[in-house]
């Protein structure tokens, strides 16, 4: 059975608590951790569009929040960016 949800993931904490040279990698990690927690799964697959959105304005200027569409199929969670 597929489970589908849309989340707005805040990344402001990553911006405030990270040095400028580590913001984008920590934002990707924060997105994964958020989805692991809320979808109750260990396997999270992120679409390339999420990665491009986070890295769009360089390493240190990440977006404040990201809207993500999440589909859970069995144990695997797949996330794509909401336009």
UniProtKB/Swiss-Prot annotation:
One GO MF term: structural constituent of ribosome
Family membership noted in the UniProt record: Belongs to the eukaryotic ribosomal protein eL31 family.
GO biological process, one term: cytoplasmic translation
Database matches in InterPro entries: Ribosomal_eL31 (IPR000054), Ribosomal_eL31_CS (IPR020052), Ribosomal_eL31_dom_sf (IPR023621)
High-level lineage: Archaea, Methanobacteriati, Methanobacteriota, Methanomada group, Methanococci
Name of the coding gene: rpl31e
GO cellular component, as recorded: cytosolic large ribosomal subunit
Matching Pfam families: Ribosomal_L31e
This protein's UniProt keywords: Ribonucleoprotein, Ribosomal protein
Disulfide bond annotation, renumbered to this chain: none
PANTHER family with a match to the protein in the record: 60S RIBOSOMAL PROTEIN L31 (PTHR10956:SF0)
Protein name as it appears in the record: Large ribosomal subunit protein eL31
